[in-house]
Amino acid sequence: MAKRKEENFCSPENAKRPRQEELEDFDKDGDEDECTISFTNGTSTLTAAEVGIIESIQLRNFMCHSMLGPFKFGSNVNFVVGNNGSGKSAVLTALIVGLGGKAVATNRGSSLKGFVKAGQNSADISITLRNRGDDAFRANVYGDSIVVQQHISVDGSRSYKLKSEKGTVVSTRKEELIAILDHFNIQVDNPVSVLTQEMSKQFLQSKNEGDKYKFFMKATQLEQMKEDYSYIMETKERTKEQINQGEERLTELKRQCLEKEERFQNIAGLSTMKTNLEYLKHEMAWAVVNEIEKQLNAIRDNIKIGEERAAKLDRKMEEQQVRLNDAEKKYKDIQDKLEKISEETNARAPECMALKTDVIARTRAFNDAEVLYNRSLNEYKALKKDGEQLCKRIEELKKSTDQSLEPERLERQKRICWLKEKVKALQDQEHTVNQEAEQFEQAIEKDKQEHGRVRKEDIEVRHALNYNQRQLKELKDSKTDRLKRFGPHVPALLEAIDDAYRRRQFTHKPIGPLGACIHLRDPELALAIESCLKGLLQAYCCHNHADERVLQSLMKKFYPPGTSRPQIIVSEFRDEVYDVRLRAAYHPEFPTVLTALEIDNAVVANSLIDMRSIETVLLIKNNSVARAVMQSQKPPKNCREAFTADGDQVFAGRYYSSESTRPKFLSRDVDSEISDLETEIENKKGHIITLQQRLSALEKDIKRNEELLKRCQLHYKEIKMKIRKNISEIRELENIEEHQSVDIATLEDEAEENKIKMQMVEKNMEQQKENMENLKSLKIEAENKYDTIKLKINQLSELADPLKDELNLADSEVDSQKRGKQHYEDKQKEHLDTLNKKRRELDMKEKELQEKMSQARQICPERIEVKKSASILDKEINRLRQKIQAEHASHGDREEIMKQYQEARETYLDLDNKVRTLRRFIKLLEEIMTHRYKTYQQFRRCLTLRCKLYFDNLLSQRAYCGKMNFDHKNETLSITVQPGEGNKASFNDMRALSGGERSFSTVCFILSLWSIAESPFRCLDEFDVYMDMVNRRIAMDMILKMADSQRFRQFILLTPQSMSSLPSSKLIRILRMSDPERGQTTLPFRPVTQEEDDSAS
């Protein structure tokens, strides 16, 4: 509730007449104990109240009621009766809330939103206040009644409509409602005006006597008077400070006034110096014109030199463009040669592999045939030798006549046959072991080749794993700082750039990395755009070469020697993007790199256009469609190349696959990339484990085969030794001269059989030799073909190596020429800017010359010859002006000094008058406040005594006694009640009373406050809930008696009783509430903070 107007405190005569008479009686007695009041049952005023009482209330969707009212209240006593839940308390709550009270003041909820019926969007309250008679509020606007309508939304906000008697909306501002309540002296947050059952319970059970005192002060509005007094005293102290400041200012003004008066007496003429000053000004005007003319001539000379230099730079740029075209043509020619060689090499690779496989197969077939032939040859030689020995032996036997040693010879012959069979078996075993050794050697060679291949694959997979792990770390770091995608040092480098820019080391702050300054319109094109821009995504832009040198020095701190640094692009910063509409590529279905990017910074867009011509590069997601657009038909106009979603680069006649499989810098879905990388890393780790297992298995196979090979070789040696030993023994036996008789016929048969075997072996050997020769020729033919194709491939490789070196040199040359061209373009641009600046300066100087000449003619129409410079004349003018000012300072101008003197005197007199007025005001205010404070203290004592007497008188009607002790110094109030006779029971705190006794005492206390408090209506909720029948009847009689004596006030009493025993009177109106709907027993409240209610209010 807003403060009352100050005149309410300053004008005691505005109070009600009865109170004024009582105060005068109190002043006459002079002592509180002697102050008496007469209680009468007669009516003090028989007229009904004209302003401020409640005429009607109507509720909609309020608390748990869809519609209540309208309730028409009488002008005096109104009983609202009904069972619990019927809406009695809702009417009282609506009265408090509807007249601007806060939700917490109702003790029914902590937020306005809790008063909206469950399931509804809003609630409405309509209260009609009486507005008649002489004290009506803006009667010409509102009429005889004021309708206050409040709309409460479900979110806790509320709005007001203040309507006239005719229903016209007069205002929607809360300030208007506060003015109405102040005018009618209505305080809805004053518990004396509206006392809820919960407020009464809290007050009477409060242990803090200071709270009761505050209750009393607020109910009687003494608290408001006290606050008004304090405010006036603070205002008085501030006014005293203003008076003290004014007195200090008066002293200073008086001193200044005397000084002005003294200076006025010492004024002298200064005409000669003023004449000289005017002549110097004439010379100064034309001296300025002379200097501007000299500056114009110098600027014209500079422009002429600049135009010649611009033409020279144009020629150099044309020469540089020719060199760049030659370098690009050379690079393209070498690149075409390399591509042709690469295509031819790739085309011959499958044939080479097939021929190599054929050579290996034919070599193996030839070796097998050669082994068979050698074996047959050895067998033939052995048979031949055996035949020769048999023939020799037969001859020897035929000559021998001695048959005595025949048994020994036969034994030797038998031994020889056995040894030969053993040699034959050993030779077969030798052949088998030799074949096994060859198989082991081939297996070892094959395993070693496989081991080398797997080992190489393992190294490649490990390199890829390390790269993926670094990429994963960068991605995880980029989740917290996206800039780390462009390198781990980038955030620190950007901080260093910011710091250097703050220290003004840069002309313009460098921009970069460029990848952080662009955004994709289509995330699926991320890899394509990265493949196109490559290192430019990590590049930085500088305005000039001075900024580039500063940035290079900063980069040295973060990029160690030997490591690659980001590229720096030097180009003057512009605020607008280049107009590329005439040279940009266009396709109705596919965007260019420029249109596929969102680039907010014009410098970034211009740099990418300069360095990569992104307006001419198309982006086509599908590979086959890209080939069709660029190669199967004529490429779109102005389109040089295209990139696919897989990062492949497509030219009109070439196609290059991308080395990358995923974007590194421009991907938006970092979590998905991290997940994919983690999966790929796990797969690679699993692959490495598989490769390691494969390597281990191959190493075991190689070791096992090598051991088996050693065993075979050792076995082979042992067999060889056995064969040599047996052959040696056979030869020894055959060389022994046998003189024994032998069976010549048997030997001859054996010789014949040996001859037949020799023929068979010879025939077989000839076939094997023929087969071997055929296989040899086939092997040689395959080797020749393989060597031929291998030689061609090696020749192509030898041709490609110098071409690669030439391509690198040509690429460097192209970059060098581009930098050279960019250098001249930058210089030309910088020079043209300077030249244009000079031209603009020339225009400005010409305009300035015209202005200065016009000004000079106004000062001196005839041009005069000036020999002194403008600076010298300026110094002379300043010296003369200072001399004149010094004379003015010592003497001054008469009119000016007179004017200053009059102003100082008037200021002094005005301030002196104000200070005197304030002094009189403060003196009068102190006298008034002293009198008013005494009156306030007397008024407080009178109200205190009246409250005590009313309380005692009301308690005595039930044979109770009570005490009210006021301590105004400590601001406390203590209340005690004695239920029985004064000498039969002791005084007790009200909390010790029974429910009925406490309720009765509460009514007595409230009636006491009602008797001394000002308010057009009083509301009391369930005042008799704890009373027995006797106390209820007595309390009712007391309330009706008071109401009858105060017909100018309205009483609204809420009770669950039927009130059927009330006397019949036109002053009493009973409003009966309908019983609540079945099941409706609680209200839909929920806890809300105090701040919500305050904000809603």
Curated annotation (Swiss-Prot):
Binding site for ATP: G82, N83, N84, G85, S86, G87, K88, S89
GO terms of biological process kind: cellular senescence; DNA damage response; double-strand break repair; negative regulation by host of viral genome replication; positive regulation of chromosome segregation; telomere maintenance via recombination
Disulfide bonds: none
Covalent link (Glycyl lysine isopeptide (Lys-Gly) (interchain with G-Cter in SUMO2)) residue numbers: K274, K779
Annotated Basic and acidic residues bias: 1-21, 815-839
Keywords: ATP-binding, Chromosome, Coiled coil, DNA damage, DNA recombination, DNA repair, Isopeptide bond, Nucleotide-binding, Nucleus, Phosphoprotein, Telomere, Ubl conjugation
InterPro entries in alphabetical order: P-loop_NTPase (IPR027417), Rad50/SbcC_AAA (IPR038729)
GO cellular component, one term: mitotic spindle pole
Subunit: Forms a heterodimer with SMC5. Component of the SMC5-SMC6 complex which consists at least of SMC5, SMC6, NSMCE2, NSMCE1, NSMCE4A or EID3 and NSMCE3. Interacts with NSMCE1. Interacts with NSMCE2. Interacts with SLF1. Interacts with SLF2. Interacts with RAD18. Interacts with SIMC1.
Domain remark text: The flexible hinge domain, which separates the large intramolecular coiled coil regions, allows the heterotypic interaction with the corresponding domain of SMC5, forming a V-shaped heterodimer.
Protein name: Structural maintenance of chromosomes protein 6
Native source species: Mus musculus (Mouse)
Gene that specifies this protein: Smc6
